[in-house]
C-alpha cells in the first residue's frame, strides 16, 4: 500500500480549527473536514485524523459539562445501592448508557466502511443537503413541551439510534440527536444537552480506537506526527469549548433554521463544484 502523504503544520491548524468550530454545531464537523481538506489541500484528512482531533472537542464538552457529569455519575452510583436515591440524575445515567449502545455496535461493525467509502464528497454533500430537510422538519413539528423530568428510556433509545446517523460524514451528530429530541417533543436546549452527554462515551472510544491509524492510516487519508496531533487536539479543545457554550446560549432564543440555511448553501455550492469537476469527489 502506498504511504499516506504527510500533513503540513498549516493543514493541521486549519483542519483542527474547522473541527473545533463545527463539532458541536449541527453542520457536520466530519463533513467540513472532508470539504476543507479537499478544496484547500487536494486530499482527505481521513477518518482517523478526524476521530483523534475529536478528543480535543471531547475534552471541551467534558469540561463544560463537568458538574453535570459528576452529579449524574454520583447519583447513578448511589442509586445502584440505595433505591431511595434513584432520582432524575440516576435515570439520566442509565439513559446515557442505553443511548450509547447503538453507535458502539454500528461503529464497531462498519468501521471500515466509515473510514473509506462514505467519505466520498458526493455522499458528504448530499447528506449535508438532505439532512437539512430533516432538521427543518424537526424544528417545525417539535412541540418542545417536555423537560428533563419527563425523559424516558424510550427517548434514550430513539436519540441513540439517531446518533448512529452521524457515522455518515455530512449528517452531523448534534444535528441528528437534536432533531430526534425535537421530534420526541423535548425542548430545544434539553435535546442539545442530552445529545452532547450521549456523545461523550462514543467520541472518546472512537478517538482512542483510531489513535494508531492517525499516525499510519490504514485507508485513504493524510498522516500526522505526534506533535501535530497534540497541537490539533489543543486547537480543537479551545475552539470546541467556545462553540458548545455559544450553541447552548443560542438555542435558548433561536431556532435551528439558521443552520439549515447554512447547510443548504454550503451543500449546494459543493454540488455545483463537484458537478463541474472543479473539485474531485475522491
UniProtKB/Swiss-Prot annotation:
Claim: Transmembrane helix is one of the keywords in the record: yes
Pfam families assigned to the protein according to its UniProt record, in alphabetical order: BacA
Membrane-crossing residue ranges in chain numbering: 90-110, 121-141, 194-214, 228-248, 256-276
Annotated compartments: Cell membrane
EC number(s) recorded for this UniProt protein: 3.6.1.27
Superkingdom of this protein's organism: Bacteria
Example of a GO cellular component annotation carried by this entry: plasma membrane
Membrane topology term: Multi-pass membrane protein
Keyword Phosphoprotein (UniProt): no
GO BP term, pick one: regulation of cell shape
Main subcellular location of this protein, as a coarse class: membrane
GO molecular-function term, one example from the UniProt record: undecaprenyl-diphosphatase activity
Catalytic activity, as annotated: di-trans,octa-cis-undecaprenyl diphosphate + H2O = di-trans,octa-cis-undecaprenyl phosphate + phosphate + H(+)
Keywords attached to this entry: Antibiotic resistance, Cell membrane, Cell shape, Cell wall biogenesis/degradation, Hydrolase, Membrane, Peptidoglycan synthesis, Transmembrane, Transmembrane helix
Family per similarity comment: Belongs to the UppP family.
UniProt miscellaneous comment: Bacitracin is thought to be involved in the inhibition of peptidoglycan synthesis by sequestering undecaprenyl diphosphate, thereby reducing the pool of lipid carrier available.
Functional summary from the UniProt entry: Catalyzes the dephosphorylation of undecaprenyl diphosphate (UPP). Confers resistance to bacitracin.
Protein name: Undecaprenyl-diphosphatase
